Amino acid sequence: MRTTEPRRRKIVLAVTGASGSVYALRLLEKLQQLKSPPEEIAVIFSDTAREIWEAETGQRYVAAFPAKEYGNKSFYAPFASGSSQFDTMIICPASMGTIGRIANVTSDDLIARSADVMLKERRRLILVPREAPYNLIHINNLKSVTEAGAVVCPASPSFYSNPKTIDDLVLTVVDRIIDLAGFESNGFRWMEND
């Protein structure tokens, strides 16, 4: 009897110009440390995201295996096509400008194009907005992407794990994103951790 190994996952992580780069940093670190990590992590920065990343985290982003960085104007990236094997895209943090372009199918950069591909192919698209408060345009755009199949997971930390540090709070959001992406996370679970 022949057994087949489970397919290793390929995901896209897009970082946009919204504040909250620490969520993306911790997400990337945690994805690489999973018991069954993704086979490949494609990383894309929007035009202002790298600048904000460096200002907020105090460090430059350098891709390390299994992560590979793609330019936001690089439409020849494999996941810009529905024929690719990338099955999940996470936009974290997701600026309202990016969400608006996705909601209105304005595929003018690799992030918006890849999100469009995920939606049209019925694959996982997780958007992590950090903005607050929302105006009516934001709410309508969030409604549109949700109706199209995206999961909107606001960067709202939970407190039932009794977090002690900012990083503890960040990890409550990161663990939720990892769960939504279909990976096994070892994060705190309500009424399961003593």
Predicted regions located by residue number:
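A cross-family phosphate/adenosyl-ligand binding-site feature
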Residues: 1-126, 130-194
